[in-house]
């Protein structure tokens, strides 16, 4: 089936050279200056890594706090022991429960974006792992969503912490903000993602780690980023 592209997509596509790599700020400004959609589009980054994810030591899963936030409200759910439920409810969390929430998930309830829990509840949550896992909602110590300091985790995810992981092709797909962010704020968030991926390089990754990086918005074509320029910016760019 032939995919029909919108008029604004074609306009942006005509401004982008498939062969040309753009400096990060140039790519951001080009995407921001294109025809506007009827909603606030999300800026996305797609990081192609030289990882064979069929091996466990080449799988990447981590989290990062975007210094300028995500631009979207994250609906947080917390599973904890019965004694803590009321305290966490008073902390401003959307959904809080214990074994009852696990049971609700088993029955199909998934109306949240991020699930946090404490280590003692993981054996209970494991029962719904087959439901949460494929949706990217299974808590993990690596991503900071399984922690003894649940209150700090709640604050971090509210501020703009997000999880990322490689897909089967070794690509990390993440957001870096909204189209109405300033170019500088989007660049700050992009550098934060890049740094985090470097810092969490899997032990099994040998030789060249990065292949390519692409930026796009929800409704735009992708722009290939000049990775060398991004590395130069990373050395000098302050996260204000």
From Swiss-Prot:
InterPro entries linked to this entry: Ribosom_uL1_bac-type, Ribosomal_uL1, Ribosomal_uL1-like, Ribosomal_uL1/biogenesis, Ribosomal_uL1_3-a/b-sand, Ribosomal_uL1_CS
UniProt feature coiled coil, ranges: none
Key words, A-Z: Chloroplast, Plastid, Ribonucleoprotein, Ribosomal protein, RNA-binding, rRNA-binding
Main location as per UniProt: plastid
A Pfam family of this chain: Ribosomal_L1
Compartmental location: Plastid, Chloroplast
A Gene Ontology cellular-component term: large ribosomal subunit
Physiological role: Binds directly to 23S rRNA. Might be involved in E site tRNA release (Potential).
PANTHER family linked to this entry: 54S RIBOSOMAL PROTEIN L1, MITOCHONDRIAL (PTHR36427), LARGE RIBOSOMAL SUBUNIT PROTEIN UL1M (PTHR36427:SF3)
Family as reported in the entry's similarity comment: Belongs to the universal ribosomal protein uL1 family.
Assembly behavior: Part of the 50S ribosomal subunit.
Protein known as: Large ribosomal subunit protein uL1c
Organism this protein belongs to: Cyanidium caldarium
